[in-house]
């Protein structure tokens, strides 16, 4: 909402320059500005807008899309403006959107949606939530790098040698790789890869120790850890990607956010529910939940539903169905601050 005394600053934020669409709601005057993306220039712009708004008793409304840098901008000007973060991915695309794209068009679209009262908003996590998510994402990045190194070593052995590739990542297997007779060049490259693997493991230990410290002070993570198949790392990771449960009006909203809601088509009296899975906002959350299904499906609370779903739809769809049930349980646990019940029917 806005008043006819306010000044709207609709922003297309970039690393070097920022496009501004300035709208004075009192006079109807609109102007376009382009300023360097620096702390001083942004403060100068806001102070100028604030002075004009104060003369008529209005406020400055800063509207920008959810992009890298929004957190530092909000910290810089949050006390001087009403800060609004737009979710442009949920905005409807105009017919020629794929042919015409510019900063001028982008700021115009965002401003138009805001004035119409239909601007979709993005969640603005606090500094603590952002730190926890970075911790989780750092671990995921290290795991992916570790997988890349292991795949390289496996591919090298498969391509150049006839050695047995089973059990390579045990202490015995790593000792075997270090003693493997190779040419001087290949020996050097393999040693580099093994050193990289060891460094990644040390970094993983540091990150997981930091996650353990967060876990020790987080009762919600400890409750989620009580679910069979979900350990400390997975509990922290799931909660970091969910964020405050108050974001979601219902369990179905959480399921949709994770990309596990069925597609839906309706026209007149015709309704059609499509495939489960896909879509959603947080693919990492979906991955974490699905990966835990190997053990979660055996919990008495879900076992009967899983067995029925396997007989009717197959194992993969059955796991998605149980993943939806798990998310409903997590929503209940976090929303009502209750512990997980392994027996009660979901």
Regions found by a protein language model. Name each.
Residues 84-121, 134, 176, 270-280:
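Short alpha-helix plus adjacent loop in nuclease-associated cores
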Residues 223-226, 232, 237-317:
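Phosphate-backbone recognition surface of nucleic-acid-processing proteins
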Residues 39-61:
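Short, basic/hydrophobic alpha-helical segments
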Residues 269, 307-346:
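Low-complexity, acidic/Ser/Thr- and charged residue-rich accessory regions of DNA metabolism proteins
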């Amino acid at each position: 909402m806005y008043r006819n005394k306010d000044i709207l600053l609709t922003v297309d934020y970039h690393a070097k320059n920022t496009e501004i669409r300035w709208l004075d709601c009192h006079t109807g005057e609109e102007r376009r500005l382009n300023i360097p993306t620096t702390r001083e220039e942004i403060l100068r712009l806001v102070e100028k807008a604030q002075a004009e708004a104060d003369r008529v008793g209005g406020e400055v409304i800063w509207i920008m899309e959810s992009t890298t840098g929004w957190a530092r901008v909000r910290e810089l000007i949050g006390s001087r403006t009403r800060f609004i973060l737009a979710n442009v991915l949920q905005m409807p695309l105009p017919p020629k959107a794929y042919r015409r794209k510019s900063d001028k068009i982008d700021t115009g679209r965002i401003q138009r949606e805001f004035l119409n009262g239909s601007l979709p908003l993005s969640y603005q996590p606090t500094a603590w939530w952002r730190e926890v998510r970075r911790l989780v994402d750092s671990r995921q990045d290290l795991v992916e790098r570790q997988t890349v190194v292991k795949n390289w070593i496996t591919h090298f052995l498969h391509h150049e040698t006839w050695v047995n590739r089973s059990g390579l990542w045990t202490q015995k297997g790593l000792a075997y790789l270090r003693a493997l007779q190779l040419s001087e060049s290949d020996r050097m490259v393999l040693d580099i890869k093994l050193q990289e693997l060891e460094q990644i493991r040390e970094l993983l230990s540091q990150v997981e120790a930091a996650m353990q410290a967060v876990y020790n002070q987080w009762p919600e993570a400890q409750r989620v850890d009580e679910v069979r198949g979900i350990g400390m790392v997975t509990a922290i990771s799931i909660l970091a990607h969910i964020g405050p449960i108050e974001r979601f009006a219902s369990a179905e909203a959480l399921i949709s956010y994770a990309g596990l809601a069925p597609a839906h088509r309706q026209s007149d009296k015709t309704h059609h529910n499509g495939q489960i899975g896909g879509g959603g906002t947080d693919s990492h959350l979906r991955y974490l939940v699905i990966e835990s299904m190997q053990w979660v499906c055996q919990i008495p609370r879900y076992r009967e539903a899983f067995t029925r779903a396997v007989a009717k739809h197959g194992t993969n769809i059955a796991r998605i169905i149980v993943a939806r049930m798990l998310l409903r349980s997590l929503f209940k646990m976090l929303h009502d601050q209750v512990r997980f019940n392994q027996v009660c029917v979901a």
